[in-house]
Amino acid sequence: MNEKHLAYLNLGSNIEPEINLVKAVKQLHEYGDGEIQKVSNAWESKSVGAAGPNYLNACVAFISPFVQAELKERIIHPIEAQLGRKRSANKFLPRTIDIDIVLFDDKSYNDKVWKQAFVIVPLAEIYPEYQNPLTKETLFQTATRFRQEVWMEARPEVLSQFKWEKQ
């Protein structure tokens, strides 16, 4: 298990998001076999898919020895459980924390993220040059377009304690 993998994670919360986003980043930072490389600002956006409180989302570049399934099982799901995440068939319920793998070893993990401003805008802060494999548009270009189409507000104060990890 000497090989290291770079995962870009999207963290989102709309239940006490200022608290839960910070707790999730701290737990990732404190995980012994992993290392945070970069943290974006938190970004506030409207709830997507159902009425509900606004979300805060941020992206983290995280290095670990685990492949995707192990990363979910050993790190992501335990953090979500510790922070009170309740899994449900309804993907649009409010949640304390949701952690998704967006990119893994420079490969797009889920192509639907290219349509999600709440993922692309924070991800573009920490990896602006990454190109959509289908369109060749960079994250910076996609985020710029989304910022003109969708309301989002940067909330740099939320994760300001992690400045040493930001680029």
Language-model features: where?
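Short, flexible hinge/linker loops that cap or flank conserved catalytic cores
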Residues: M1-N2, K112
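Extreme N-terminal starter segment of soluble prokaryotic enzymes
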Residues: E3-Y8
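Short beta-strand-to-loop capping motifs
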Residues: L11-S13, V60-F66, L103-D105
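Residue-level signal for inorganic ion chemistry
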Residues: N14, V39, V60, D100, ...
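Short amphipathic alpha-helices in soluble, non-transmembrane regions
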Residues: L21-L28, L71-I79
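Short, surface-exposed acidic-centric catalytic microdomains
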Residues: K23-Q68
